[in-house]
Amino acid sequence: MTPYRDVPPVSSRTHSSNRDRSQSRSRMSHESGSSVSTTSIVFDRISERVAAGDLSEKQPRGDDNEDALKDEPDNDDLETGPFLGNASGNGNSPRHAQKKGPGMDRGMRRALLIAAGLLVSAWVAGLFVYIATKSYKPASATAHDPQATIVRGSGKAVTLDQVMGSFWRPEVRSIQWIAGPEGEDGLLLERDAAGKDYLVVEDIRSQDAAAVDSSADAQAADARTLMEKGSFEYGKRVYNAVKVAPSRDLQRVLVATDVKSNWRHSSYAAYWIFDVKTQTADPLVPGEPDARIQLAQWNPTGDAVAFTRDNNLYLRKVGSDNIIQVTKDGGSEVFNGVPDWVYEEEVFSGSSATWWSEDGDYIAFLRTNETGVPEFPIDYFLKRPSGTEPKPGEEAYPETRKIKYPKAGAHNPVVELKFYDVVRGDVFSVDISGGFADDDRLITEVVWAGKQILVKETNRVSDVMRVVLVDVAARSGKTVRTTDVKAIDGGWFEITHQTKHIPADPSKGREHDGYIDLIIHGDGNHLAYFTPLDNPDPVMLTSGDWEVVDSPYAVDLDKNVVYFMATKESSIQRHVYQVKLTGEDLTAVSDTSSEGYYAASFSIGGGYALLTYQGPGIPWQKVISTPSNPRKYEHTVEENKDLADNAKKHELPIKIYGTINVDGVELNYVERRPAHFDASKKYPVLFQQYSGPGSQTVNKKFTVDFQSYVAAGLGYICVTVDGRGTGYIGRKNRVIVRGNLGQWEAHDQIAAAKIWAKKKYIDETRLAIWGWSFGGFNALKTLEQDAGETFRYGMAVAPVTDWRFYDSIYTERYMLTPQANGHGYDTSAIYNTTALGQNVRFLLMHGLADDNVHFQSSLTLLDKLNLAGVENYDVHVFPDSDHSIYFHNANRIVYDKLTNWLINAFNGEWIKVASPKPNGKRRAA
């Protein structure tokens, strides 16, 4: 589900800015002794009790409505104790009666004091011996061990302030690889680097001369400055660069300033053509420096720019002030070269629907007609997205933005691929027989292959896909491949944007043009090489009981080598591999001798790669020469030393990975335990999940997030299980959810909870589940399906509650249309309010300006609860917040609310308020 990408992954987001390393001054009370050993705390307590004349009985325990963070004298585990509450979870244990016993005589008191003194002296002596023999090792001297199953030490506790800020985020460098003017490989853009001009083209090998293999011809290219400063003057104003894109010949830079966000990926900006030689800029639209441009792109040869303004496509050639208007029908309901809301969100995951041909002679662009798409209003009560001031007298009214939003079963936008011949100056389309009707067509990917172009189309419900090959010069085309996914496994076609054109080169053994695509093969997705372009029978480059992910990454055309990422070692790991175009010699690029979760970014020619290790250990990054490159190079660009130091000094949760068997299917899980986990205790459990189709939450990344805080900071156990429907456990386990979202996803969470409830260290009366977006939907569906039998509590943020309310392209892929699957929509909705009423309590939160999962979902559920008289829930709404819930400190409030609500749940507070009664007697009116 697209909402998955918007779920704020607290503290797992990457960034390149300097981290705020300051510690929070408002530390929780239970942290105050974190730097002192447990042993010393025990002796301090003995001394306190001796001084108080009390060694015979435990201190009374307060009611659950006392400070949840208050230390409990009868529990020496400072991390878990304050948060465990009553083992029964009912919040009604009485205060122990305090009986005043007979006084202790002075002789006995003196003897006890002497004995305590001797014990303390012996302990101090033992401590000196311990240190002298180097047996003692402070927490700050122990490196983070992701494989640890037990933590002993007295490091600092993980706090919510830390996970909400940047304290636990790895520093991640990004490299913008570019092609050299003469075809050089290994060139990159450096932007705003310390001690350098603002925008510089460098050879990666110049970053570390010592890393270059001196035995090879490895001379680095000279650095070249494109922009000396990040700002420039035009007229009487200074403009600051926000986005930059150099031309292929590096003579000019396309610069965006004054960028204003539109939807998730799209924005408006003023665009400029910056001249490298003169260091001056001119507006992309001559004479209009403040023109609001939606998209601008260089052509591959660097002598023209295509751009979209007011939903019309334009062209400007370098050296000319003449603007060519390619289309004239753009407006509020017709888009040219940019996607509408649903295509931006669900198909392209980006703001561009413009594709230049490799020689710059043609532009392919998507024309989207929204005329028949219904509008959905979004009200803004505090901000004005339009940027305009209200009319006099209308200041007290909200601004309403109407979005063309196709819900399940409603009219979809009509899309068609158009072409512009730059030389002839005309727009044309190519009709190909056997295609889908206008109301039954999605265009999901467009890839140029020389003078020809590959187009992927599917039917509306995404279970039949065809690949069309268009000869643009001849203005003709044909269907070269059709896949009936429904017939294969009953599932759906998964959109990808990684298809790679492989040009013909007889000298390299490639007689014809071809392309590499990710296709269904066996029970997963694998790489296939189709050559010639119209050949429907591929050479399989990969196969096996594993899957290729978001690939191919890159292709070295000189060596006929393909680089890709896959789950070959484990479904919760990611490694980088290479394979020849013949399907032979599949070998690993990353180190597979140990567990790892890698990502990679390859240079244009595939000779170099930025290899990013994301876990389970402390993340690091290296730039390496690829195996096909004879010039050996390796340079570490990020070690995350500060993060490693933080991990040493803090008590991170213990992560236990494994699988559980549910109905014969092995499901991945990760259990996060408190650092000082004690199997003799009874812990409450929070289940966190997303559960959306094809998603994965259990993985081997290094992450210290909200779930980590729940375990390490609150002392609860936090479990994540990827149930059926999620990714990388085989397509048969993925597509089983089609037609009835929520049935198997909720079933598997309940089955997992029953497994944990039987564990000796789990308090089965205190189980909760939470999620955001699809995870919020599944949290509610789980509570509904379980009806209080296993789970007692739930927290849902921005949930879908009826799939009729969500967008058509996403929903119908998994549910078909409401017209064809009405019963499935009925049963997948959150409808059984009686079952929800059998839980102790649940929490619902939503942003009022959510353009993705509309507030309509939560309002409809609230209406159902009202009609049924169900009141065991709390609601919090966030004005003007979209799906990510950030406006006006909202994101922090979300996690504060989750934290405090969960503490109250596990302390039994919600049981107390279930049947409120007045204190004392009141006289009837």
UniProtKB/Swiss-Prot annotation:
Residues 1-104 are annotated as: Disordered. InterPro entries: AB_hydrolase_fold, Peptidase_S9_cat, Peptidase_S9B_N, Serine_Prot_S9B/DPPIV. One of its GO terms (biological process) is proteolysis. Its EC number is 3.4.14.5. Residues 132-925 are vacuolar. Keywords: Aminopeptidase, Glycoprotein, Hydrolase, Membrane, Protease, Serine protease, Signal-anchor, Transmembrane, Transmembrane helix, Vacuole. This is Probable dipeptidyl-aminopeptidase B. The lineage of its organism: Eukaryota, Fungi, Dikarya, Ascomycota, Pezizomycotina.
